[in-house]
Amino acid sequence: MTTVPCFIAGLPKAELHLHIEGTLEPAMMLRLAERNRQPPPFPDVETAEKAYRFTNLQSFLDIYYRSTEVLVTEEDFYDLTLAYLEKAASQKIGHAEIFFDPQAHTVRGIAFATVLRGMEEACREAHSRLGISTRLIMCILRHLSEQEGMTMLNEAVRWKRWITGIGLDSSERGNPPSKFHNLYREARREGFFLTAHAGEEGSAASVKETLDLLHVDRIDHGVRCMDDPALVKELVRRAVPLTVCPLSNVKLQVFGSMQEHNLKAMLEKGLMVTLNSDDPAYFGGYLNDNFTAAAEALDLSFSDIIRLAANSFNASMLSIVQKKIHLLELADYARGFAPGH
């Protein structure tokens, strides 16, 4: 009988919750620091890996922002993005929607265009050479002011041919969705696809407020929605996608272990859940690792796994025609395997 990891390895899928800065592996971090003649955040790979032990979201963010300082040139952002897309293609990811945090770079004097041009060149090459499609989502850092976010939104409008979505990330506590109500209203007026992190370290109320005030197309994380049955029913009724990141949730102690994760319960409630790797260089695994860890710990069936993959395409920004092409490929792949597990 086909093993779950083997089935997942060949499974056509999309990734919708991936921070490009979170793919900065320690070896690349050290290489870029040397290339840019900067002191490295850590002296060696081993020290960096030991530092990747987090107690909560903020302990991760402290290291995350420190590490991004090695990203300076257009070439750096190109190398970082292409490395992820090559990894993604090797894991049968046919489409990726990639977050980037320009405020983490512009505050250091790096031009917005430097970040975007490097990323876009890598996306074009990956599409041509590997066949993987991409969309870019500019994230606003929620620990900064809405006015600072508006400055970034104005930049995004200028680069709308490359940026298709607006997101909201960084520390959820003390930075409610209402803080960015005006920004999201303007982003919606400009025609951007809207998503936001909610219900990771925040409560179910944060998810509800994100839906009601920001009018997002998708919720990133959202696992705390399960604490509010009425909210769950509303999410199911509206078919709002939730981009869940299991290894991230365990690494940041949202759940004590993978066995305690509520992913399977979310599926059983009929929520449109997708699986994602979030910041794989820091959380111990890329997308296939997340699928495998969740499947084995939660005893997911083959039909559960196929449903998660189908959700990833249905929840994406792809056109209806593009979604159908991917879903047909997924159906053809699944047809060759037994439905049971």
Curated annotation (Swiss-Prot):
Residues given in the record as Zn(2+) binding sites: 17, 19, 197, 278
Catalyses which reaction(s) = adenine + H2O + H(+) = hypoxanthine + NH4(+)
GO-annotated molecular function: adenine deaminase activity; zinc ion binding
| Biological processes, Gene Ontology terms | adenine catabolic process; hypoxanthine salvage; nucleotide metabolic process
Report residues binding substrate.
Answer: 279
Q: Which UniProt keywords apply?
A: Hydrolase, Metal-binding, Nucleotide metabolism, Zinc
Question: Which HAMAP family does the entry mention?
Answer: Adenine_deaminase (MF_01962)
Biological role: Catalyzes the hydrolytic deamination of adenine to hypoxanthine. Plays an important role in the purine salvage pathway and in nitrogen catabolism.
- Identify this protein by name: Adenine deaminase
Q: Please name the source species.
A: Chlorobium luteolum (strain DSM 273 / BCRC 81028 / 2530) (Pelodictyon luteolum)
